[in-house]
């Protein structure tokens, strides 16, 4: 379970491939979000079910704005771990910390730690304009390895800023946008369509929600997709209010249907 906690990126970039093989259309223009998409001091908790069985739990917390090298920044932390029967089979946890530029909504740095049955994998990324320097160390690596990626004029996000971009996007029905996301050492292209509004049931009661349908693709550093890899599909519901809280995410994978539900929110 790699970062199984977070709206589009959660299901788009984790788990098994969805059973569809269609190739993506040309990337939609990635216009900036209307707002930052993060609220200082907010916290969220989620449960993840696989084929109806509890498989994971996750938490996310947003800090208060501060200053770093003359820029206003905000820190976002998240943690996901196996739970229930899944935890009896394998203990996996994934922690990530992002420093985000408040003005642009872009990531400045990312630190992550994955522990899989006691084996640790670390990864960090430093973002500057259209480039990123990624350092990682797997359990089998004697020392950390570093690679530099150049994306030109394309804006690249981490999981936290991708979530924020979606929350801050005030779209009209049928609108499509493309977001590129770094997850570990891998680059993903995520295409999201604003599908409309509906009322859904949740652990917090019936809520009016806005719905997004998405597809994610493994991408190369030149932003083209790896054509031999099938697309992954997912649906995201955000609360239809000023908070735009992720209420629910669903996806169909070869492992079964994945459902992530919000269980607690405060700000």
Task: Indicate where each model-derived feature is located.
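Acidic, serine/threonine-rich low-complexity disordered tracts
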Residues: 14-129, 168-267
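Active-site/ligand-binding surface loops and adjacent short beta/alpha elements
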Residues: 130-185
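Short, intrinsically disordered low-complexity segments
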Residues: 1-2, 70
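Low-complexity, intrinsically disordered regions enriched in charged/polar residues
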Residues: 4, 156-160, 194
């Amino acid at each position: 379970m790699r970062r199984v906690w977070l709206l589009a990126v959660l299901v788009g970039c984790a788990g098994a491939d969805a059973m569809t093989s269609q190739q993506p259309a040309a990337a939609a223009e990635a216009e900036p979000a209307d707002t930052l998409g993060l609220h200082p001091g907010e916290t969220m908790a989620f449960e993840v079910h696989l084929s109806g069985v509890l498989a994971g739990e996750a938490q996310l917390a947003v800090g208060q704005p501060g200053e770093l090298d003359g820029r206003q920044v905000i820190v976002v932390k998240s943690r996901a771990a196996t739970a229930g029967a899944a935890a009896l089979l394998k203990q996996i946890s994934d922690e990530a910390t992002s420093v985000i530029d408040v003005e642009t909504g872009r990531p400045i740095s990312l630190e992550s730690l994955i522990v899989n049955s006691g084996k640790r994998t670390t990864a960090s990324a430093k973002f500057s304009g259209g480039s990123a320097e990624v350092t990682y160390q797997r359990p089998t690596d004697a020392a950390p390895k570093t690679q530099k990626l150049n994306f030109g004029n394309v804006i690249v996000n981490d999981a936290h800023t991708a979530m924020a971009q979606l929350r801050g996007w005030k779209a009209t029905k049928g609108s499509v946008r493309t977001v590129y996301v770094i997850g570990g050492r891998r680059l993903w292209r995520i295409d999201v369509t604003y599908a409309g509004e509906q009322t859904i049931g949740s652990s917090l009661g019936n809520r009016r929600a806005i719905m997004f349908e998405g597809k994610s693709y493994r991408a190369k550093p030149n932003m083209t997709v790896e054509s031999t890899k099938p697309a992954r599909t997912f649906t995201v519901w955000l609360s239809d209010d000023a908070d735009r809280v992720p209420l629910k995410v669903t996806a169909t994978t070869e492992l079964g249907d994945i459902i992530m539900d919000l269980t607690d929110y405060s700000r």
